Amino acid sequence: IGFVRRRDFRRNYMQLQFTPRPTTPLIRKLRNELSFDYITTLDGRLESRQLRYLLAPEFQNGDEWWLEYNRDFEFLSKPFEIATDVVLPIGPYASESIYSAYNLGPQRPVNGWVGFIRGSFFGGTRTQVKYFGRIELSPILSVEPRISIDWINLPQGHFISKLVSGSFNYTISPRSFFSALAQYNTSTDSFSTNIRFRWEYEPGSDLFVVYTEGRQTDDRGFPVLQN
């Protein structure tokens, strides 16, 4: 859906992990993670809290399956426009969600993961489907398609948010590479691009050349330059 920068806060975070190796011939290891994130303002008022449990078996072929439970709390200190004409009012919001994903191992020429989220969301519900892929066309060339679709149902309104992006990575030499990213976001009606060149001209010293552009797509015709 998007991100908002958080200011003037204090954070406490705890994570426990236990990863046994079962004797079964199917599973290589079984990762268990429990984390707790607690964020307050500087004067001690609770802003955000997240309890998360992850169960992730890694199979003998290198693939992984993730099953995650999240229990969240968020306090909005001012109204927030989450989508066009959909404004969340001030107040506390509690939510629960289940996330499941299957991850193809990096040893495959075509790898990546596909995931699904379902749960409560700011007094309503959210269903999300996402895909992140990586295709190795050659040892020096790869492409990474990504897509995320959210179906949001809130008391203030209903909307669908789509985020589609793709990147292109080319390794020129062991010391230099070129990459390009293009992204389209329906929530903000924006299209952005990022082009980057990196050259390590001597060990420990790098030169980066980066070009970034953002355009609005809510007007008719060619997208208008935003930044």
Q: Which sequence ranges carry the predicted segments?
A:
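Exposed, low-structure sequence patches enriched in small/polar residues
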Residues: 1-227
